[in-house]
Amino acid sequence: MIGYEQLLLQKGSLASTLELLQAVYQSTERQAAAGMVTQNDVLSAKQNLDSVQAGMMTIEANEVKIRQTLCTMLGWAYNASPEIPEIPEVDPARIEKMNLETDTQKALENNFTLKYNRLSKETLTNGSVEMQNLLRTISAQEAEVKASMVNLYYAVTQARNELGNAQTALSLEQSKMDLAERKKALGMVGNLEYLQQKNAFATAEVNVRTAELGLLQAVEAYDWAVQGNLTLSQ
């Protein structure tokens, strides 16, 4: 579901970019007709537009494919059109409740691989080679869980900081967008300049939602590890 929404975000971002590049291409053509730019400039603008259009076609094809897969997995006909709701934001309380020390202890207790190996230990003879090997394996796995929990914890912290930065950037672009809207109403801004600001604002919106999804993924990965669902290399 997260992957599907991320794809829709890319689609929305490209749609805004397409609108801007279409305007840039048309403006470049007019400038070329007036002798203000060369045909190479026109070609470059057209290539940029074509590249983004190709990217949009790829995203739309992937959107159909993912949607059909989701429908099939959920028991609908592959060509059904169910409403797929937006994924909710992370509850800040989930992050506030995180405690690396106690959560790491829970992860050690709950890890399925460690549980299996601890049970296997009960079937071995004390002092045997097999017992010694298993004890070393368990020790290495416990160290891996501890290290992974540290990494997952700081991944959440980093994702939260990235969201804060994205929200700050969006606030700035919102102010610029509001100003551009007022200027447009008064005829004080050209269409190309307005579309550039509109695209910058749309990009900032996408960045915030992308950061929200990134934070959700980081929190989910942390919670899964606490519940014992951490794959170990040993």
List each model region and its residues.
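Leucine-rich amphipathic alpha-helices with coiled-coil/heptad-repeat character
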Residues: 11, 18, 25, 32, ...
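Short, solvent-exposed, mixed-charge loop/turn linkers that connect secondary-structure elements
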Residues: 60-102, 114, 219-234
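Charged, solvent-exposed structural "stalk/scaffold" segments
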Residues: 6-58, 161-209, 223-224, 230
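Charged, amphipathic alpha-helical oligomerization/scaffolding segments
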Residues: 51, 58, 62-65, 123-126, ...
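Small/polar-residue-enriched beta-strand and adjacent coil segments characteristic
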Residues: 95-144, 148, 152-155, 190-193
